[in-house]
UniProtKB/Swiss-Prot annotation:
PANTHER family in the cross-refs: DNA-BINDING PROTEIN HU, INTEGRATION HOST FACTOR SUBUNIT BETA
UniProt source species: Teredinibacter turnerae (strain ATCC 39867 / T7901)
GO cellular component: chromosome; cytosol
Domain of life: Bacteria
Function summary: This protein is one of the two subunits of integration host factor, a specific DNA-binding protein that functions in genetic recombination as well as in transcriptional and translational control.
Subunit composition and interactions: Heterodimer of an alpha and a beta chain.
Name recorded for this polypeptide: Integration host factor subunit beta
Length: 98
């Protein structure tokens, strides 16, 4: 699902807010979450999950076009850990599939 599809689906399910208001709210939430992670903060949304940064150590990678080895620097990457309610809900939904 893309951000645009998320906004559309939310707009279809309620009639109190305009699609533009929903779009603004979604963009503001995502921007604030990105800023929090950029500041090194952890985000926890109970029942949904948590976002944090994990450090990826320096390593030797490979250029897929040439096959030559390339040294990659260490970096922080965003990490999402689903909450128990989210895991349970996903697993229940998948059990119903053929």
């Amino acid at each position: 699902m893309t951000k645009s599809e998320l906004i559309e689906r939310i707009a279809e399910r309620q009639d109190q807010l305009s699609a533009k208001d929903i779009e603004l709210a979604v963009k503001l939430i995502l921007e604030y979450m990105s800023q929090c992670l950029a500041n090194g903060d952890r985000i926890e949304i109970r029942g949904f999950g948590s976002f944090s940064l994990h450090y990826r150590a320096p390593r030797t990678g490979r250029n897929p076009k040439t096959g030559e080895s390339v040294e990659l620097e260490g970096k922080f990457v965003p990490h999402f850990k689903p909450g128990k309610e989210m895991r349970d809900r996903v697993n229940e939904s998948l059990e119903e599939l053929p």
